[in-house]
């Protein structure tokens, strides 16, 4: 029996395959595409290394009515198994972009092939920078009042990782897209901006949840409240003098590096300007010398030319004495 999934690792080839599947089947529509995920489960870490699309249809008016081709799935899995016997069905993917009512039934269908399938929602048209995958697993939840058990999706961490061969391929694909003029500092600032934006979104979600609990709209979940308390306890006290001093020192160091970089860039540009100016002056001097040289005139035949003419006449017999009659 496989270990219960705690996190997922999605490879870039899977993302490319899903985007290709979506562009071929459901581009410019409101439909989504569904497929199977292949990989391995290593102590709860699900490594998704391959995938393939499945014929899938669902009724737009009634999302609970859907169709998935089982025979196609089993035939495809048998062919993939011949290529790589280590890859097993670990779950399924959907282009979402959110959880839909039929997802619980589809997830139960994939339990035939793996005890704990993961559902990965892949956003094929992300509006924000970041990881375009969200992973979920189903957990059983018991209602304290009715003692009835229900299944619900629980979010688990998701990341993008690649092996060496995949990294080389991705670098070739992004070679014409990547702008080499972007400095590492700009990249770091962009990454920090994205991280802060995600942090703000998570804080707003926690605030909204706590407000609903205080208003009595939602029942308090002590596990979630405990997680929020741990996050608050781990947050630093920004009002402390040491942290303010550290921020000031870091900011001063960063500004010093930026200032020195600008100065070096200016000095190099000035040096190149001087070199170009010197080269232009040398070129102008050479042009003046060439223009001031008088043109050559026609001269009398040289001694060498006369010698050649004499040899030619001797060859023709012009210098031989004529015979007397």
From Swiss-Prot:
Gene3D superfamilies: Cytidine Deaminase, domain 2. Keywords: Proteasome. GO terms for molecular function: metallopeptidase activity. One of its GO terms (biological process) is proteasome-mediated ubiquitin-dependent protein catabolic process. Residues 292-302 have a biased composition (Low complexity). One of its GO terms (cellular component) is proteasome complex. It holds the Pfam family MitMem_reg. Residues 8-142 form the MPN domain. Residues 285-325 are annotated as: Disordered. It comes from the Eukaryota. PANTHER family: 26S PROTEASOME NON-ATPASE REGULATORY SUBUNIT 7 (PTHR10540:SF7), EUKARYOTIC TRANSLATION INITIATION FACTOR 3 SUBUNIT F-RELATED (PTHR10540). Acts as a regulatory subunit of the 26S proteasome which is involved in the ATP-dependent degradation of ubiquitinated proteins. Belongs to the peptidase M67A family. This is 26S proteasome non-ATPase regulatory subunit 7. It comes from Dictyostelium discoideum.
């Amino acid at each position: 029996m496989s270990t219960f999934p705690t996190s997922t690792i999605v490879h870039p080839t899977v993302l490319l395959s899903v985007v290709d599947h979506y562009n071929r089947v459901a581009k410019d529509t409101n439909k989504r595409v569904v497929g199977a995920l292949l990989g391995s489960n290593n102590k709860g870490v699900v490594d998704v290394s391959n995938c393939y699309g499945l014929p899938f249809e669902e009724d737009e008016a009634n999302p609970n009515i859907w169709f998935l081709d089982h025979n196609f799935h089993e035939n495809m899995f048998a062919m993939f198994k011949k290529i790589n016997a280590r890859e097993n069905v670990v779950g399924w993917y959907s282009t979402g972009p959110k959880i839909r009512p039929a997802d619980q039934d589809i997830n139960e269908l994939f339990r035939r092939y793996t005890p704990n399938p993961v559902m990965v929602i892949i956003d094929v048209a992300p509006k924000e920078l970041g990881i375009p995958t969200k992973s979920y697993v189903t957990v059983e939840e018991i209602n304290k009042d009715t003692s009835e058990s229900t299944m619900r999706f629980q979010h688990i961490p998701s990341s993008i990782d690649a092996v060496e061969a995949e990294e080389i391929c991705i670098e070739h694909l992004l070679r014409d897209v990547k702008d080499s003029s972007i400095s590492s500092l700009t990249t770091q600032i962009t990454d920090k901006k994205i991280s802060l934006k995600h942090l703000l979104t998570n804080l707003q979600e926690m605030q909204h949840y706590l407000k609903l609990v205080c208003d009595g709209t939602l029942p308090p979940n002590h596990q979630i409240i405990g997680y929020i308390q741990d996050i608050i306890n781990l947050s630093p006290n920004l009002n402390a003098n040491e942290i303010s001093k550290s921020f000031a020192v870091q900011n001063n160091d960063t500004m010093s590096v930026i200032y020195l970089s600008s100065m070096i860039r200016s000095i190099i540009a000035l040096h190149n300007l001087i070199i170009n100016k010197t080269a232009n002056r040398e070129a102008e001097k050479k042009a003046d010398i060439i223009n001031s040289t008088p043109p050559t005139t026609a001269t009398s035949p040289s001694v060498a030319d006369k010698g050649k003419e004499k040899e030619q006449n001797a060859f023709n017999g012009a210098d031989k004495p004529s015979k007397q009659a």
